[in-house]
């Protein structure tokens, strides 16, 4: 029997003020999943003596987030995970997951809530320490109006898609990465966002497969601390509906999207 339990999506907004009047905001949802064999009796016998209530977990996350002295989502998850294991020895392992609520800075004290792409992270810890840390950026939407093609693909009686030598390309993308040493040298998801956008801008791709492969290789070249990268990219490119000189209209007649995945590991 394999068991786990925990608390999902605890919302918190952490604000830190500095002497120069500048404020930093770290807003996110945090989930905790507790793993271990010490909770069997709660399932098999209804014996809750070893059970840490999920409401207690919520309170722990909120209170211990105040004590965190860093400024990254990854660091906060590791801080909380270690705190759970130290405070509750009955927990054999914990998996902490965080999803950023993105606030973009407008001034030293003013921020705007953005609903687009956001950072994510997962940290798994056991008695031996940090087992794995995975960072990511999800819901990234990128549109490139020229500099992409899709030609020379397999054709048969079912194929109606025309070849396009130069096309707009509109993608939705999630990307995650793991570290060679999860304890140090973390890569910020905003930096990854900028690298992906730069690659999309200057690389002339023959397909989305070609594009994500180039993105992954550039990430591995830039950040030697990354051990593995995984992409999930959806093709949201619209179909042409009209053209008049330099003006073009595109539409989206079908809701189905192509899905392309890739995992690259450092050799």
Residue spans for each PLM region:
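N-terminal intrinsically disordered, cationic/polar leader segments
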Residues: 1-267
